[in-house]
A protein has these predicted regions:
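Hydrophobic residues within beta-strands of alpha/beta enzymes
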Residues: 12-13, 53-56, 135
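C-terminal hydrophobic helical "lid"/dimerization subdomain
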Residues: 44, 88-139
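Adenosine-nucleotide cofactor-binding segment
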Residues: 1-45
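CheY-like receiver
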Residues: 21-26, 49, 97, 121-124
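Glycine- and other small-residue-rich loops at beta-strand/loop junctions that grip anionic moieties
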Residues: 31-36, 59-63, 83-84, 107-111
């Protein structure tokens, strides 16, 4: 899950605390943080590592749906929080980006499963282990 973003230049660490140490050493925090893991503490952690007056973008559907965070952090930093919903109607745009070479789909960490392995695919996707970001079930 971390190799692909790192190959694109993202700063990748296992926790917000590790990221915060990196940013403290650089004396610079990112002005925009994209949180797409949906983890239980990820929303609050994204606020913690966003630069003052910056923006935290929460992508997808966080789990659990009710998120708990300290209002002190975004209030003190004067952060903007923006939620980005998923969309069903983006297939044509995505295929065009792949065709034009804007997105390199072959580098995207996807595991493919046969139809009879569908239960395993769902279990693997839910477990979020390893580098897999998506499970694809093929007939």
């Amino acid at each position: 899950r971390q190799a692909y973003p790192a190959s694109l230049g993202a700063v990748v660490r296992n926790s917000a605390e590790e990221l915060e140490k990196v940013f403290e050493e650089q004396d610079s925090y990112p002005p925009v943080v994209f949180e797409a893991s949906g983890g239980e503490t990820a929303f609050a952690e994204s606020l913690q590592i966003t630069e003052a007056a910056g923006k935290a973008v929460i992508i997808g559907i966080p789990e659990p749906d009710d998120q708990v965070f300290s209002a002190r952090v975004p209030r003190r930093k004067e952060l903007t929080v923006q939620f980005c919903r998923r969309s069903r109607n983006t297939l044509e745009d995505c295929l065009q980006m792949v065709a034009e070479g804007t997105v390199h789909a072959s580098e995207y960490p996807v595991d493919c499963f046969c139809l009879d392995e569908a239960p395993d695919a769902f279990a693997a996707a839910a477990a979020r282990e390893g580098d897999m970001i998506r499970a694809v079930v093929q007939p």
